[in-house]
Each structure stands twice: as C-alpha cells, then as structure tokens.
C-alpha cells in the first residue's frame, strides 16, 4: 500500500499546467466506439490510466487492433465486427467500462463475461442491466444481475422507448450503443440532461441521434453501416483539472492556468460553482473539434458557502474536491440530491463526511448529501482513501493547508497518473511504501 504525506504551503503559487491527464470519459469512448468504425481511427493523448487501459485491453480482446503512430495511437476495427473473446473481459476498477460494454455487447452476437476488481464487484449494475433486460437482453450475474461478474449472451434487441429514472451518462450510453445495433428507431429520455460525450462523438462519426426540445433522444440504428473513424487529440480532463482549480481557490496568493481543457458545458459545472463561491475564473477557447477546448485561469479569492442541488450529474465527480473548498469557505454549504455519490468507487457521502470530521470540520450527513460549516482545518491526521482515487486526490488538497497523510494513494493512478508529480511542483509530497494492507 502506498502512503502519501503532504506538507502545507507557506505562501501562494503561480503555475501553468500543460499536462493535466487526458479526459477519461472521451478516452473510454474513443476505444469502444472504434469497434464500430469502418476504418482506422487516429487518437492522440489517450489517457494512460489504469481504467482506460482496461477499456483498451477489452477492445483488443473484441478485435480492435492497436498500434502506435508517432506520439499517437491507431485503432483499427475488426473487419467482421465484434468478435467473441477467448477470455474474461477484465474492467479493473472502471465503472464506465463495464456499463458501456454491457450495452454494446448485449446487442452483439456472442458470449461475453465482464468482471472487475473487488471494488467494482461491489458496485450496482441494475441501472444498466434492468433496462437492457426489459428489451430482451440476456444478462446474468450475482444478485440477479446487479453485481459483477456479468455474463452476457449477446443478440439483437427490440426497439425501445425508455424513460430513465436517473440522469446518468453511463445508462444513456449503454442504451444508445444497444439501439445502434437494432433494426428500428428507439427513444431515450432522462429527468435532466447528463453528460453528452456519447451523442457528440457518435454524431461526429456519422450516427443519427436526434434530440427534441425536451431532451428526448431518437436513436436510429446503423443497419449494417459502419461509423466514420475518429481523428482527435483528447483534451485535458476537466474533472482532473478541477483539483488544481480548488488548490488555487483555497490558497491566498495562488493562481493557476489549466491548459487545453475540455469545456463541454456538462463538464464544467463545478468550475461555475467555484466561481459562484467567489473564486476568480477566466476561460479562453482554443479549438473546437467534436468538443470545445480551451484554457481556464483560476485565482484565489475569499470563498463563501453555497448550496448545490441542481445539475448534480454535471458535477458528481467533482463534489469531493468541492467539499474541500466548502470546508474552507465562510458560512455553511450544502449538497443535496446527490445520492448517486453512495454508489461510486466508495460511498463518497460517508467517506467525505468522516474524513472532514477527522480534519475538525463540522459536517452533518444526509441520505442524499451533507452540510458543511466552513472555517479552518486541523491537521496531523491520516485520511483513508477507501481505494477511491477522487477521495485521495481531494484530501491531498487539504494537505496544502494542514499536514496530513493519505493511506492507499496508489488508487490515484486509476485516472490521473501524474497528479502527485504536478502537486509536488507546488507542495512537498512524500511517498512511503508498505507491503501489507
């Protein structure tokens, strides 16, 4: 188990960061969608994190050929479509991978087994499995298909008109991937718009996905047609960049410029909340290919408490880092309608609450969120990451203010392998290793 100690800063900092980890959501999708393309895709800056490498390995098992080309990669699709794999498909800790692959493979001819690590095998899959089963998918697993490993007997599925009870990009993406392989148009709606990378990328590849004024999607099947190949440089992940936005916001005299960041409106809601709390932000667009990309400058200013209760699906991954900003803001902050946090890599509501209490913060826990009374932090404590990369990175930010130790920090490598390298450029970070857990 890796242990990380963070020593607090004595003064502010100014830094430009050109090497934020590539966007995880787009990296996952670039590999998966390339299985449906007509010719080789050319991808630059594919995220070399554990989650996305598991996704890429599975794509290779399903027939995708991956070769290096300069600093990029070429994804050549299987000529005869998705092939039945020889072995189990290991998703590691990647919830996005298993849920998107369930949708893709449920409608693909063949026998498939999706599995993952101990953390993933505890995460619920019914939100994807049940709607797919309702249109004929044969998916089996522990707890009546709710828990991995999942066995899929892929076959053509019936057209559907599905109204999701939750706003989830993973559920939406799974249903879209199944619908593309059908014979008639399907329909999908959700209570509020979730992240839309899947629609944007697939439209760019030639798929027809229509959206009405209420956000209801009409999904037209490919009917044997192959998609156009992707050709893209994957931008920096705004969820990863947000850690350093919070770092700048909470440290007096700090300023950070985050370069080449994905600026999709469904992905920068946390930045808008931070700005509403008082931090100074400036955006500049640098390019627009599939997605809007640009730079974000963040500088310190006194933060005020805030209530976050809307568009939760747009900032669900950033809420742990935002909790650190809330703990150092003036007044009370509250997060509501975020029950989804309980089924992430850890129960992020309980873990955030318990770790903030260790730091001396007054916090009240609710079923769907928490209320934080801002003020100061008390250091000299050990934070348990619970194997959750976003918990480990979020509380590393608290280490910029007070000294602390984070247990099981190796989980950071899942999504942001160079996080500690960047953090070390502004703070003293010490690694210690232990052989036993």
From Swiss-Prot:
Superkingdom classification of source: Bacteria
Intracellular or extracellular location(s): Cytoplasm
GO cellular component: cytoplasm
Major location category of this protein: cytoplasm
The keyword Transferase belongs to this UniProt entry's keyword annotation: yes
Active site residues of this protein: 317
GO terms for MF: 3-phosphoshikimate 1-carboxyvinyltransferase activity
EC number: 2.5.1.19
Entry-linked CDD domains: EPSP_synthase
InterPro entries (alphabetical): Enolpyruvate_Tfrase_dom, Enolpyruvate_Tfrase_sf, EPSP_synthase, EPSP_synthase_CS, RNA3'P_cycl/enolpyr_Trfase_a/b
Role description: Catalyzes the transfer of the enolpyruvyl moiety of phosphoenolpyruvate (PEP) to the 5-hydroxyl of shikimate-3-phosphate (S3P) to produce enolpyruvyl shikimate-3-phosphate and inorganic phosphate.
Assembly with partners or alone: Monomer.
Protein name: 3-phosphoshikimate 1-carboxyvinyltransferase
Species in which this protein is naturally found: Wolinella succinogenes (strain ATCC 29543 / DSM 1740 / CCUG 13145 / JCM 31913 / LMG 7466 / NCTC 11488 / FDC 602W)
Name of encoding gene: aroA
């Amino acid at each position: 188990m890796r242990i990380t100690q963070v020593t607090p800063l004595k003064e502010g900092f100014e830094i430009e960061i050109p090497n934020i980890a590539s966007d995880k959501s787009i990296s996952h999708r670039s590999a998966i969608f390339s299985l449906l393309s007509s010719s080789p895709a050319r991808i630059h800056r594919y995220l070399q994190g554990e989650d996305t490498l598991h996704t890429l390995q599975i794509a290779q098992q399903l027939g995708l050929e991956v070769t290096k080309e300069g600093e990029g990669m070429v994804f050549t699709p299987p000529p005869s479509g998705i092939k039945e794999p020889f072995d189990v498909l290991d998703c590691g800790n990647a919830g996005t991978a298993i849920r998107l692959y369930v949708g893709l493979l449920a409608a693909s001819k063949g026998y498939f087994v999706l599995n993952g690590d101990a953390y993933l095998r505890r995460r619920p899959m019914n939100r994807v499995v049940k709607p797919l089963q309702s249109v004929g998918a044969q998916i089996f697993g522990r707890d009546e298909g709710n828990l991995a490993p999942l066995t899929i007997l892929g076959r053509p599925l019936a057209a559907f008109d599905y109204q999701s009870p939750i706003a989830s990009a993973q559920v939406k993406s799974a249903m879209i991937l199944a619908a593309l392989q059908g014979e008639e148009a399907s329909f999908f709606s959700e209570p509020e718009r979730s992240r839309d990378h899947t629609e944007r990328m697939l439209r760019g590849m030639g798929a027809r996905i229509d959206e009405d004024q209420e956000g209801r999607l009409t999904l037209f099947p490919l009917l044997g047609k192959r998609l156009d190949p992707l050709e893209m440089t994957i931008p920096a992940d705004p969820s990863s960049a947000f850690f350093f936005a919070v770092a700048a916001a909470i440290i007096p005299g700090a300023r950070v410029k985050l370069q080449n960041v994905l600026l999709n409106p469904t992905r920068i809601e946390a930045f808008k909340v931070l700005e509403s709390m008082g931090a100074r932000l400036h955006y500049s667009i640098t390019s627009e290919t599939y997605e809007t990309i640009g730079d974000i400058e963040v500088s310190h200013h006194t933060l005020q408490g805030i209530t976050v209760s809307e568009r939760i699906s747009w900032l669900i991954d950033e809420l742990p880092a935002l909790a650190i900003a809330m703990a150092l803001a003036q007044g009370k902050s509250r997060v509501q309608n975020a029950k989804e946090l309980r089924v992430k890599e850890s129960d992020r509501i309980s873990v955030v609450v318990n770790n903030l209490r260790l730091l001396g913060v007054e916090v009240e826990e609710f079923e769907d969120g928490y209320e934080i009374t801002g003020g100061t932090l008390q250091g000299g404590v050990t934070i348990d990451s619970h194997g959750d990369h976003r918990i480990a990175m979020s509380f590393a930010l608290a280490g910029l203010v007070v000294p602390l130790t984070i247990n099981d920090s190796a989980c950071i490598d899942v999504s942001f392998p160079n996080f500690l390298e960047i953090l070390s450029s502004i703070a003293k970070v010490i690694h210690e290793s232990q052989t036993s857990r």
